[in-house]
């Protein structure tokens, strides 16, 4: 049984009961509601944990963890460039199935620098500056041989420093 988006949201509402290491995580909320979204490959939420900010992903596709492990190995072998750090936490999220048995699921933490998504940044930065920052990011990705394969505004963060970095590496090559 795979966790649902509703279950993921419930787990984030009371992390100390559902997560092995992320029990002290604080999810992003709107009012009293935990903000969780769904992409093609994962459920995701923004969290604060140990004084740092992360995207927390619960993969909904079997190859996502394997792909992230591969990206991390390659990033360590070469210069990380604009890539953000990913940490796979194995058997992190606990689910109690209908038979009363515990099941554990892997999650991914991806470093999230302070900033805003590209789609929001267009109202705060000059378009020419954003365009140049995107070209620089693409050049840095090319220099380390990294192909994101789904680089669009929802997968790009503009850091407070103006540096542009990619998020969500499921489709990377």
Residue ranges and their predicted role:
Residues 32, 40-85:
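ATP-binding glycine-rich loop module of kinase domains
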Residues 142-159:
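Catalytic-loop of the protein kinase fold
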């Amino acid at each position: 049984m795979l966790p649902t988006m509703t279950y993921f949201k419930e787990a984030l509402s009371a992390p100390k009961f559902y997560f092995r290491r992320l029990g002290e995580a604080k999810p992003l909320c709107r009012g009293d509601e935990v903000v969780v979204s769904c992409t093609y490959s994962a459920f995701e939420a923004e969290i604060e944990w140990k004084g740092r900010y992360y995207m927390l992903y619960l993969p909904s596709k079997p190859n996502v963890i394997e792909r992230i492990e591969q990206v991390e190995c390659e990033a360590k072998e070469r210069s990380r460039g604009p890539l953000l750090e990913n940490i796979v936490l194995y058997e992190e999220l606990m689910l109690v199935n209908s038979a009363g048995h515990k099941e554990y699921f892997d999650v991914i933490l991806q470093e999230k620098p302070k900033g805003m998504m590209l789609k929001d940044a267009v109202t705060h930065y000059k378009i020419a500056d954003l365009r140049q920052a995107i070209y620089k990011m693409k050049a840095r990705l090319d220099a380390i041989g990294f192909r994101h394969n789904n680089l669009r505004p929802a997968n790009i963060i503009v850091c407070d420093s103006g540096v542009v970095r990619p998020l969500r590496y499921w489709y990377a090559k």
